[in-house]
Amino acid sequence: MFLKDFSFELPEDLIAVKPVFPRDSSKLLILKSLNSYQNCLFSDICDYLLPGDLLVVNNTRVNASKIIGLKKTTKSKIEFTFISNEKNGIWLCFALPGKKVSIGNLFVFKDVEGKVINKDKEKIYIDFGTKNNEFTSILKSFGEITLPPYISKLRKFEDQDNEDYQTIYAQKRG
């Protein structure tokens, strides 16, 4: 199997850039066998579940972890996606454009400053030190959900995306 096996043309007008409402009116593809499938709605799912079947649901909340940082020396805007608070205020993140980020750079996120202490290929580590709690609050208040590239090229982030990109079972931060 090759990556090119998954490449195909998908017209933009077939890409859903917003979820359907109500949510259970979304499409559901039922695969009956290798050569037999049926299109239906998610609200019909109970018609296809049998006793003993296992239905797995995702109860993880999508983190709003994308935020713009200003490079302290040049004031250039860099888009950061924060993945995890590794330890003692040191965060693992990715940046676009990553090539403009170097070890030792200082970035300001709203009014909290962080220093790049390590960079390994795409991974970047920023130390917020004693300002970690303040940064965490800023990320919760101003962070955005990262939209998939096929959507972000068609439209900008909207506040409603913070709810629309959560499953109805979302409880735990993930």
Model-inferred region functions:
Residues M1-G174:
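A cross-family signal for N-terminal binding/gating loops and helix N-caps
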